[in-house]
């Protein structure tokens, strides 16, 4: 009679003891099977000399609790150094895996690196994911992002903000590339990222393609576009949305002015220029703007001359109700979204491919409210 048989015999009159005994035996058996599985995968026993210099080795284990009819058992799932071993003794715990994979995608969208996610998941849940596995899980979002780029758009938006931000991307060499972004507000006040695209730098040809794509997907009518001073934007808008009005971002205009004047004049110029968007009506704003011309023309003739050239685009927001003017004289709304992207991108240092960047931005865009 072996030890197991003796223990069973002693426990026969106590159901709890039998369950506890069977639970312990099952736990040991499963752990032995898992270790045998890894040995077969590696091709050598623990500490064996024939395992030297094979390119792979044992790398500890992670713990997993499994429900059985005899109670919970604690399993030590062995790991290999290269992260290639996948055990077949235990079935995948699908519900738990789904929770973890959703957590991985959420952490990825927050800008946490794949290595940090792998470490965090193991510490929190005792489940081992290599950085490569984390990256593969995040790739599950690729079809959703592709569908997002192709989705049917609403036919009307009251206002559309256009702006580009720069994100580090590797294409053989490391460069900062432009992410073109369009955020819209519908007549009911709902906000959404309409679409975005990635290109090496900002130019009007890419903006034109993005605008044409938006129209081809159903966006027929826009009341107002807001953008900075990228050359050719008004022309591109006139071709695609000829009925739309255009407001140049006053914050960008002010920054450009301050970059072209003396340091000692910047504070006064900035404070006076801000008065333009704080008036009760358009007529009062025109008076303030013309007073600004008169005061600074002698010192900065080239700046004032350029400002006069774009005057028709500076005060368009006054044509709309006072309650919404604060939201439509600048592209601050889209810049807030850009800042979120930059903050989340920072820990990643750079994106290895355009697709990885597209997926990351897509997750941000789809969760934008």
UniProtKB/Swiss-Prot annotation:
Gene Ontology molecular functions: DNA binding; transposase activity
InterPro entries: Transposase_mutator (IPR001207)
Keyword DNA-binding: yes
Pfam families cross-referenced by the UniProt entry: Transposase_mut
UniProt keyword terms in alphabetical order: DNA recombination, DNA-binding, Transposable element, Transposition
PROSITE patterns associated with the record: TRANSPOSASE_MUTATOR (PS01007)
Signal sequence range: none
Disulfide bond annotation, renumbered to this chain: none
Any one Gene Ontology BP term: DNA transposition
Family matches, as PANTHER family: MUTATOR FAMILY TRANSPOSASE (PTHR33217:SF8), TRANSPOSASE FOR INSERTION SEQUENCE ELEMENT IS1081 (PTHR33217)
Family stated for the protein in its record: Belongs to the transposase mutator family.
Functional summary from the UniProt entry: Required for the transposition of the insertion element.
Protein name: Transposase for insertion sequence element IS1201
């Amino acid at each position: 009679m072996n030890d197991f048989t003796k223990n069973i015999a002693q426990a026969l009159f106590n159901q709890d003891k039998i369950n506890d005994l069977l639970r312990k035996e099952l736990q040991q058996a499963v752990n032995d099977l898992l270790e045998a599985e890894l040995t077969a995968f590696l091709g050598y026993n623990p500490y064996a000399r024939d395992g030297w210099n094979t390119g792979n080795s044992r790398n500890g284990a992670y713990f997993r609790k499994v429900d059985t009819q005899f109670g919970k058992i604690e399993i030590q799932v062995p790991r290999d150094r290269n992260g290639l071993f996948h055990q077949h003794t235990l079935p995948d715990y699908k519900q738990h895996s789904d929770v973890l994979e959703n957590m991985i995608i959420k952490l990825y969208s927050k800008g946490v690196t794949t290595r940090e996610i792998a470490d965090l998941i193991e510490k929190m849940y005792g489940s081992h994911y290599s950085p490569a596995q984390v990256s593969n899980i995040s790739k599950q979002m690729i079809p959703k992002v592709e569908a997002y780029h192709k989705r049917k758009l609403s036919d009307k938006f009251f206002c559309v903000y256009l702006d580009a931000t720069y994100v580090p991307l590797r294409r053989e060499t490391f460069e900062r590339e432009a992410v073109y972004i369009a955020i819209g507000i519908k007549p009911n006040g709902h906000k959404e990222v309409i679409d975005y695209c990635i290109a090496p730098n900002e130019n009007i040809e890419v903006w034109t393609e993005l605008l044409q794509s938006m129209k081809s997907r159903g966006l027929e009518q826009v009341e107002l576009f807001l953008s900075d001073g990228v050359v050719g934007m008004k022309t591109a808008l006139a071709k695609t949305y000829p009925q739309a009005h255009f407001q140049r971002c006053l914050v960008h205009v002010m920054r450009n002015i301050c970059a072209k004047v003396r340091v000692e004049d910047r504070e006064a110029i900035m404070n006076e220029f801000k008065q333009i968007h704080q008036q009760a009506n358009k007529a009062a704003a025109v008076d303030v703007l013309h007073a600004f011309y008169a005061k600074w023309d002698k010192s900065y003739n080239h700046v004032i001359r350029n400002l006069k050239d774009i005057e028709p685009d500076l005060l368009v927001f006054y044509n709309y109700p006072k309650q919404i003017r604060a939201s439509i004289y600048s592209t601050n709304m889209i810049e807030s979204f850009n800042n979120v992207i930059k903050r989340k991108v920072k820990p990643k240092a750079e994106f290895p491919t355009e697709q990885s960047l597209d997926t990351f931005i897509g997750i941000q865009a789809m969760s934008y409210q």
